[in-house]
Structure formats: C-alpha cells, structure tokens
Swiss-Prot record:
GO terms for cellular component: cytoplasm. This is Uridylate kinase. Pfam families: AA_kinase. ATP binds at residues 20-23, 63, 67, 170, 176, 179. Pathway: Pyrimidine metabolism; CTP biosynthesis via de novo pathway; UDP from UMP (UMPK route): step 1/1. GO terms for biological process: 'de novo' CTP biosynthetic process; UDP biosynthetic process. Its main location: cytoplasm. It comes from Cereibacter sphaeroides (strain ATCC 17023 / DSM 158 / JCM 6121 / CCUG 31486 / LMG 2827 / NBRC 12203 / NCIMB 8253 / ATH 2.4.1.). UMP binds at residues 62, 82, 143-150. Its EC number is 2.7.4.22.
Length: 246
C-alpha cells in the first residue's frame, strides 16, 4: 500500500487537523445505514487533504445507525442507549477505514472502548506517533463514556492530538443566523465567537464541545461536506466557510 504526498511547494495553513462529520453524512440519500458511494466520496475528500501532507484525525458520529438520545426518548436506559450509539460509531469508522485504505492511505481505527480484534485501544502517545507517520487516525466510540456526544469527543481528541483546528463538515457552507434551508434571508457568519454560538444556540456543536474548544483556543471551521473539494480548498485558503474563534 502506498500513499502519494503533495509536492513540497504546496502551501497549507495547517499541519494537523480534526475532521468531524455526522453519521448521517454517510447515508447519502438513504434514510438509514451506509451508502458506499458516499463513503467513498468522503474518503476522496480526505485523500486530497492527505496529499497536501496534512496530518488528519477523524471522528464520525453514529446517527445513521443508532442515536443514543432517540433510544433514551423511547424508554431505553440512557446509559445503554449511549453505549449502543458508541458501537455504531465503530461500525462507521471501520467503513471509512476500508474506503481510505482502498485509496492507498494507511489508516488506524482507535476506539475509546477496547475491542482489540477490530481496532486499536486509545493510547495518546501511540496515536500521535501514527499521525507523525502520516497515517489517518479515526477515533471511534466517542469518549468511551455515556452522556458525551461525538462533537465533544472530537474536541477532546483534537486537543489531545494538538490539532490546530476542528473542521466540522455539514450540509451547509457555514454557520447561519437561522436555517438557510428554510429561510431565504438567512445570513452566514464569516467569523463568530464561541460565546455567541452558545448564547444564540447557533447549532455549531453542543455546548460542552464549544466550551472545550473555547477554553483551549481551538478554532472550529464549519463548511459544506457536499461541496466537491471543499475540505481541501479551505486548507489552501479558498472556499466558503465560517470560522468559530474567541
């Protein structure tokens, strides 16, 4: 397996980043589960950034398979429902690993819940070493604890891995004052503060994740994952996005 690198002259803004995407992003137009062509398309977006020499961490939600809050709302014990959601993220991580490795990118799935036969346990120093070797690290099973979202897990791992930013791939090209899919007069922020996101409930991430990013001065870049080349373009200083910062 080989992995092509970008020419040394290619200028990028970041050396190490965290990409956070929802499980629903892997569904395509389906209502449930994984849509292999969509998984492959997202893998190619990651490949384009990897070719720039950027070290990539990745966290994927599990909502396309099971969402803990929904299970809890239907009468299931919240802790059990959350653990089921964590297992769903492992399934998504394995699917993305297969897609990335089919493109020649060395990838490691690292789980907060030990399951040695399918992925590595989370050991911070080992994960950092993988990144230094230009392997993509997919962090699965959230934080390993119930009551924490994958947004919070992504922010935690981004801080532990010393990432320079979190890239939140969504259905829209940034943060808006209201849902642009419902309101034609919705306005996009170029930049917005962590506190404003919290005060106005802008829906960037959950409150715990935003507070953790704020307390560690970790920027959040919100962009459209549906825009071809969008992830790579932002790293080249192009494209449309919103930057959440202090």
């Amino acid at each position: 397996m080989t992995s092509e690198a970008a020419p040394a002259s290619t200028a990028v803004t970041y050396k190490r980043v965290m990409l956070k995407i929802s499980g629903e992003a892997l569904m395509g137009d389906q209502g449930y589960g994984l849509h292999p062509p969509t998984v492959q398309r997202i893998a190619r977006e990651v490949q384009a950034v990897h070719r720039l020499g950027v070290e990539i961490c990745l966290v994927i939600g599990g909502g396309n398979i099971f969402r803990g809050l929904q299970g809890s709302a239907q009468g299931m014990e919240r802790t059990t429902a959350d653990y089921m959601g964590m297992l769903a993220t492992v399934m998504n991580a394995l699917a993305m690993q297969a897609a990335l490795e089919s493109l020649g990118i060395f990838t490691r799935v690292i789980s907060a819940i030990p399951m040695d036969q399918v992925c590595e346990p989370y050991i911070r120093r080992r994960a950092v070493r993988h990144l230094e070797k230009k392997r993509v690290c997919i962090f699965a099973a959230g934080t390993g604890n119930p009551y924490f979202t994958t947004d919070t897990a992504a922010t935690l791992r981004a801080n532990e891995m010393a990432c320079q930013a979190i890239f939140k791939g969504t259905k829209v090209d940034g943060v808006y004052d209201k849902d642009p899919r419902k309101f034609a007069d919705a306005k996009r922020y170029e930049t917005v503060s962590y506190d404003e996101c919290l005060q106005k409930h802008l829906g960037v991430m959950d409150a715990s994740a935003i507070a953790l990013a704020r307390d560690n001065d970790l920027p959040i870049i919100v962009f459209s994952l549906d825009e071809p080349g969008g992830f790579c373009g932002i790293l080249r200083g192009e494209g449309t996005y919103t930057r959440v910062q202090g």
